């Protein structure tokens, strides 16, 4: 999952930091290390959790984690998220949502098949900070946005499907995970440079990128 977009934590069990050569197990050439996101899987017990957050700068967020056991060998889990938040910076906001249903089937002892799908949508205004003067942040109002918020949009739509199979063989476990993903991403922003000597003008550069 190498595409550059803002990932959310709503459906993660944990994050593993694999340092040095350990990162090579993924076949990506990440010799310096990688962060491995471990997604939540169905449990063979009931679980129902809902969380709501309200905060400063119009922050609103809700998450849900629902799990159910279906018979003796099947379980399903549904994770969902929605967030809409502002910022201390003028014109900066974000809205994102995600849903991740998963199903686990364990027909035999030592055999487990897990199928999952995730849809994530993220739209926001890119915030590249304030200008600088003489090698340090300029003495300006921190709420100032340099550029045009209407032309600094970041958008991502992500669809990820996965199938994971585990088979115990004696004391060893054989694992195979297949992932198919589709990404629709656009990034555009303005970058403020250093202020002029008279502190009256700021040079702006801009670029965009689509995946």
Q: Which role does the model predict for each range below?
A:
Residues 1-21:
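Periplasmic plug
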């Amino acid at each position: 999952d190498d595409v550059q977009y803002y990932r959310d934590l709503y459906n993660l069990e944990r994050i593993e930091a694999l340092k040095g050569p350990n990162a090579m197990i993924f076949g990506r050439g990440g010799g310096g290390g990688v962060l491995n996101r471990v997604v939540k899987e169905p449990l063979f017990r009931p679980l129902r959790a809902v969380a709501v957050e309200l905060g400063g700068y119009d922050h609103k967020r809700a998450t849900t984690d629902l799990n159910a056991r279906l018979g003796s060998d099947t379980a399903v889990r549904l994770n969902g998220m929605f967030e809409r938040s502002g910022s201390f910076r003028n014109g900066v906001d974000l809205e994102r949502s995600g849903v991740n249903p998963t199903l686990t089937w364990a027909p035999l002892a030592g055999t487990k098949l897990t199928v999952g799908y995730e849809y994530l949508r993220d739209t926001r205004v890119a915030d590249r900070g304030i200008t600088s003067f003489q090698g340090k942040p300029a003495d300006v109002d921190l709420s100032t946005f340099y550029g045009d918020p209407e032309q600094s949009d970041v958008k991502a739509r992500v669809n990820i499907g996965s199938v994971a199979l585990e088979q115990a063989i004696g004391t060893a476990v054989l694992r195979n995970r297949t992932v198919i993903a589709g990404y629709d991403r656009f990034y555009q922003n303005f970058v403020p440079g250093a202020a002029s000597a008279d502190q009256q003008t700021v040079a702006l550069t801009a670029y965009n990128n689509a995946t």
